[in-house]
């Protein structure tokens, strides 16, 4: 059996040298090392040997198997390298061809509008202030001159977590925090972008939406400063021909207060279906900061005045891009979002 094993080793090695394809190498492996291969047959025949010879012959068979498996791996690497070299030598690459342009994503329309609003007010010397979305009742209501019995404090309209902690219903609390941080220095000149939460859900309202509010506090601030600021914003956001109109209104944290309209972005003020024939579209609320709010912020209303304004980003985006249903902004439909 030893002579037979030596012959198998020699013939298998010679046959392996003649192999020149991966298919032929696989055939060689099955014939020599496979379950029905030559070496397996030798192992099965060990039972016919005397008991004292079996361990020695078994060790010799395993030695031959290990040697042939090593040569098999070497041959496999050699053939793979040869095939790769042949494939590369047969291919040609035209380096003058243009590269493949990878598709790139785009910003969400709300992000585009928020970024544009930020740039407009940064250009006017404002800084960006931020605050927590989970807010204390004190900052969300009390410090903004909203009394305990105000409808906005109804738990049916706001998302309360505990009796004195809720999801903020506007970004106005950031104005109080900004005044507390900056006092007693002047001026205070900030915008406060962020998410807010209310119990609304229809074509023009969402339980979560975005606001940008602004605050200016300094000596000698007038309503004229407010109007000039908002006119500048409207013309930079909607075009140089836009006009604004201020209508008397009421907000607990400003006095006097005004709703702000712009001349219709569709008809230019002539009257159309979008503006319902009025020529005007409402965009935000504003007013002079209430003296009590100044006091809560740590300023003396006898020495300083200020103005504030607040806008819904979704409203601005709908007007700017002609979107008629707010819910489109949150449905993640790529056919819609890819337009921006």
UniProtKB/Swiss-Prot annotation:
Q: State the top-level EC class.
A: ligase
The protein's required cofactor(s) are namely: Mg(2+)
Q: Which Pfam families does the UniProt record give?
A: Phe_tRNA-synt_N, tRNA-synt_2d
Q: Name one GO biological process term.
A: phenylalanyl-tRNA aminoacylation
Q: Which domain of life is it from?
A: Bacteria
Spell out the SUPFAM superfamilies in the cross-references: Class II aaRS and biotin synthetases (SSF55681), tRNA-binding arm (SSF46589)
Reactions catalysed:
tRNA(Phe) + L-phenylalanine + ATP = L-phenylalanyl-tRNA(Phe) + AMP + diphosphate + H(+)
What does the record say about how the cofactor binds?
Binds 2 magnesium ions per tetramer.
Q: Which InterPro entries match?
A: aa-tRNA-synth_II, aa-tRNA-synth_II/BPL/LPL, Phe-tRNA-synth_IIc_asu, Phe-tRNA_ligase_II_N, Phe_tRNA_ligase_alpha1_bac, Phenylalanyl-tRNA_Synthase, tRNA-bd_arm
Kindly indicate whether the keyword ATP-binding belongs to this entry.
yes
Subunit text: Tetramer of two alpha and two beta subunits.
The identity of this protein, by name, is Phenylalanine--tRNA ligase alpha subunit
Organism, as annotated: Heliobacterium modesticaldum (strain ATCC 51547 / Ice1)
Q: Which gene specifies this protein's sequence?
A: pheS
